Amino acid sequence: MSAEALHARPGRVRLALLGGAGGTALLLAALLVLPQAREILAAGWLIGLLFWLGIALGALVLLATHALTGGQWGRALWPALAPAAASLPLFLLLILPLVVGLGTLYPWAPDPEHAARSIVAQRYLNLPGATLRGLVALAVWSALALLLVGMRAGGLRQMVAALGLVFHMVAITLLGFDWVQSLEPHFHSTSFGMASLVLQLMACLAWATRLRPTPSEAAPDVGGMLLAAVLGSLYLGFSQYLVIWYGNLPEKVEWYVLRQHWGWLSLELLALLLSSLLPLVVLLPSAVRGSPAALAQLAPWLLGGILLHQAWLVAPGAGFWTLPVAALAVLAVGGLWFGLAYGLIAGRFIRATEAGA
């Protein structure tokens, strides 16, 4: 695979960087003009960060999986996966606005030793600890991604891949609580980390098939993985809801009660339709799963549904105006990420190897 093949079109890269810079400038202007809206701005940035970071982490997991299992799908998706995974160090910078906004976004941040909270929660949920966990996880993810992209096939690369998958599952479980579940500090779900992992895989597969149409010989594998991710997402989401409903746990029910107010329920139903029900129906026929064109056409709907789901997770606590702010944040984070990942990184930092091996 040549380095040139990893480049996005130059015009697309410039447009992405321009959009990212413009979105960032608008958000910064809003912060200066409306300092009282810090919570809304932080929540919007978190939504954009979760969406694009999810694609990059999905690429890391797929590269690690392919290093262990092999297959045509990895070779076919390599030009899209490698720049996305190698871009993970960028998120050490993109996370900084969230770090600055931690104190306004999370209810536990102003008073980490509130008497109503358990000793364990007081020791775990605090600004230094949450910041350190986030930065360490991003640093390790970045190192793993650069190793997987740069190393040749062999036992050492497989060992890195195996250790990376174990670390990722632990890290995404912890950060899923830190960044999302702790928006309501009394809520926690042991399946949230796995659900996040499945969404990352789904988002990255959709992104890769849209960015670079899958060759016909690899399309059935990619379509099968997409269908498995859709089924996994449906199962984990429903089982979490069922356990909480059946257990009648008031502190956990509050999470769902808040997200059924205003139009939040409609938002999640639309997300469910786009990211789960529609793809499930479309991908059931094997002819569709094996069609590169069909997968590429389905991808935007999947990505849109995943983005709406991220908004449903984060936005209700901050209010309706988080949604337009989130749209700007998606443009800002995504523009900067895409422009740098598929321009600078794809051209300069990714070594030409066969199938990333």
PLM regions and their residue ranges:
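C-terminal TM-helix exit segments that contain a strictly Trp-centered aromatic cap at the helix terminus
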Residues: 94-106, 236-243, 308-313
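Hydrophobic cores of alpha-helical transmembrane segments in multi-pass inner/ER membrane proteins
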Residues: 53-64, 92-98, 134-146, 198-212, ...
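Long, contiguous internal "core" modules enriched in hydrophobic/ aromatic residues
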Residues: 3-31, 121-271, 288, 292
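N-terminal regions that are enriched for targeting/export leaders
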Residues: 2-56, 122, 338-357
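Membrane-interface transmembrane-helix boundary segments in multi-pass integral membrane proteins
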Residues: 189-196, 251-274, 315-346
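Transmembrane-helix bundle segments that line or gate the permeation/cavity pathway
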Residues: 49-154
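Juxtamembrane "helix-exit" motif on the non-cytosolic side of transmembrane helices
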Residues: 31-40, 178-186, 311-318
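Extended, compositionally biased non-globular segments
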Residues: 261-313
